[in-house]
Amino acid sequence: MTQETKPRALNRLKSMYELRAEVDRMYEGGVEASEEGKPVAWVMLEGWSNAILNAMGVKTVFPENYSSLCAAQGMAEPFMERSEAEGWPSHLCGYARASVGYSARMVDLDGKIPPEAPGGGMPKPTLLVASGETCDARFKWFQSLGRFFDAPVWTLESPSPGIRERLSSETYERNVQFLIKELKAFVAFLENLLGKKMDWDMLEFTGGGTNEINRLRWEINELRKSRPGPMHTRDFWSVMTAALFRGAADPEVIIEGHQKMYDEVAERVEKGIAGINRPEKYRMAFEGLPPWHTLGFLDQLAERGWNFVIESAYRPMRPRTIDLSMYDDPMERYVRRRYRSLEESLQEEYEPDEVEIIRNEIIRDGISSRLGLKHISDYQVDGVVLHVLLTCRATSAGLNLLQRRILDVLKVPSLVIEGDIIDASAFNAAEALRKAEAFEETMDHYRKVRKELGMPW
């Protein structure tokens, strides 16, 4: 008599594997380009440069993503140790530390890829493209990497006005003009470095592909509002790399892969199939960056019926519909197609009466308690996991405030788990699981509270 094998807790999407394979091809393409003497850029994720670099014939790889790949395969620790030996502190961003250690190893090998590097490794860069937004390490991280290779570093700046200022249409227009000027300067730098002119038609192709990929990602996420949640956060994290860190991959290939994923998720919605192979007991949201080194922790939570149906990091924006026919400048079209005002976002995301409340709160207080919460209510989650990172102040500093706002406004509790994106030693999975078990009583309690208040879930 044969014994039935219990299916694994996560019900992975078949279409995920095809998109995930594109990430491997990205790194393979970088190595091949380097071997052929073609330019390769190491890029910090900032949303603008990849399409421009690809239009200029530059292959792109991302140290941020490569560090997470190393962590997921259990190969980050040697690079982290090397960065500490080079004098870098242990509280620095894990992405930065791993890439610094990797770069130091390359110097040991006269610029060759370390033989222990997973995924084929990153080749020696022709240039590095940094960003001045969000990350604490910012451009200093990439300036430091440039010293290992004597490679030029370009820092792309992006305007970051306060919330109150962003309500102004004048601020929005100034931001647009700032970005146009900044990106044109970047193009001029590339033309001088590479000795060739920008192919503006190619930028229309690569930039347009980025927009179509974002549209499909957004539509897939809309399907994830269904009960039971048809797509788990692990699948989202696995495929977001192919969209955001796609390097010089053909946009049409990535679009086709996301269309297949949309179709598969839509079929699951129609048939009531969940992203976990257990009854969906709790619908969960994940706030913060992932613990790339211990993603199996989410499998353990899935065994308990925790279905992570939405996440904050790397979430796509609502697609933008805009008439660009009045703009002759291809760079202006590139910017305006993607950069939206706060007022526009509010009008798209909220009901008119709520827009007025949010606008008044921002004018009065400089912030609104309702901002950043909509996905919690839209996906009707029972609890939120807050991943607090010692090494990433940018994503962690506001989580305590977020925890309070989620509870006050939506009556949804949060579980704080301390860890790291790359450093596995900073994450205690057993302790986190014990806290999760106890947290279930809290989620059960607030379900009753929401019901008594007449809330939708």
List each language-model region with its residue ranges.
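A charged, amphipathic alpha-helical module
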Residues: 2-39, 180-320, 361
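Redox- and metal-dependent alpha/beta enzyme cores, enriched for Fe-S-associated oxidoreductases
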Residues: 35, 46, 54-84, 288-364, ...
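An N-terminal, globular interaction/scaffold subdomain
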Residues: 40-121, 134, 141-142
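Extended, charge-rich low-complexity interaction segments
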Residues: 94-105, 182-204, 336-365, 442-457
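A short, acidic, amphipathic alpha-helical segment used as a generic capping/interface helix at domain edges
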Residues: 112-116, 353-379, 397-401
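Proline-aspartate-enriched helix->loop->beta-strand connector
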Residues: 125, 376, 380-386
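Cap/lid and interdomain-hinge subdomains that line or gate substrate/regulatory clefts
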Residues: 143-232, 441-457
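Peripheral docking tails and interdomain loops at the edges
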Residues: 400-457
